[in-house]
């Protein structure tokens, strides 16, 4: 699996699909299963394929997604809000799923981005091992910098399986994070808008 550089600008050591499958075979043995039984013969291959999908964000550059913008919007300069963007991620501590929604708003500075691009940025950062706090900040910072926006606001509301299926087991617990930049942070009336 080919990976992009991490935040420390270091490229992780590459691991082949075969090495990943071998690791999953060991995990099956570790939990007490027989990886040679009929129902599990293809499991290491399937899990390797699933992990490629779960963590495809390591192969994407969200800033590149935002490289094409549009200026012909007839002077539109007010807030653009995209709500209920699906978030499917995994916590970096237990690799347990994080399922939720993101609401993203930005105030353009003469140029706007295609609406699907906002959702793609959310997905690009979501498809990595994450903390919700970092995910919220990464989305906001990337939009602010790439679009030269006047302001960005990001809210994520999600359920963490590491809290619902293990440990404290609080099935109804959700986590909400907010991050404001530019005019959203500076203008109290804008920061009170619950996107």
Which residues are covered by each model-predicted region?
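Active-site loop/lid in soluble adenylation, ligation, and acyl-transfer enzymes
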Residues: 2-98, 183-185
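Histidine-centered catalytic/metal-coordination loop motif
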Residues: 92-137
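Beta-rich nucleic-acid/ligand-interaction surfaces
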Residues: 44-50, 157-165
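Structural motif
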Residues: 77-80, 103, 151-153
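Well-ordered alpha/beta subsegment
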Residues: 123-159
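Beta-strand elements of well-folded, non-transmembrane domains
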Residues: 89, 108, 158-160
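Conserved small/polar residues in nucleotide/adenosyl-binding loops
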Residues: 193-195
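Short, low-complexity, polybasic intrinsically disordered segments
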Residues: 162-191
């Amino acid at each position: 699996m080919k990976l992009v550089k991490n935040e420390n600008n270091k490229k992780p050591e590459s691991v082949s699909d075969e090495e990943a499958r071998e690791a999953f075979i060991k995990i099956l043995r570790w939990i007490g299963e027989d990886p040679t039984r009929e129902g599990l013969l293809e499991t290491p291959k399937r899990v390797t394929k699933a992990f490629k999908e779960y963590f495809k964000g390591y192969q994407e550059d969200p800033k590149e997604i935002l490289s094409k913008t549009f200026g012909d919007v007839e002077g539109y300069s007010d807030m653009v809000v995209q709500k209920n963007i699906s978030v499917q991620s995994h916590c970096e501590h237990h690799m347990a799923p994080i399922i939720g929604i993101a609401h993203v708003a930005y105030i353009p500075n003469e140029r706007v981005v295609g609406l699907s691009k906002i959702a793609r940025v959310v997905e690009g950062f979501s498809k990595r091992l994450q903390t919700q706090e970092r995910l919220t900040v990464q989305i906001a910072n990337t939009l602010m910098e790439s679009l030269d926006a006047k302001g960005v606001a990001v809210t994520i509301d999600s359920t963490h399986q590491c809290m619902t299926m293990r440990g404290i087991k609080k099935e109804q617990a959700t986590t909400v994070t907010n991050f404001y930049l530019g005019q959203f942070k500076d203008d109290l009336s804008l920061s009170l808008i619950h996107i």
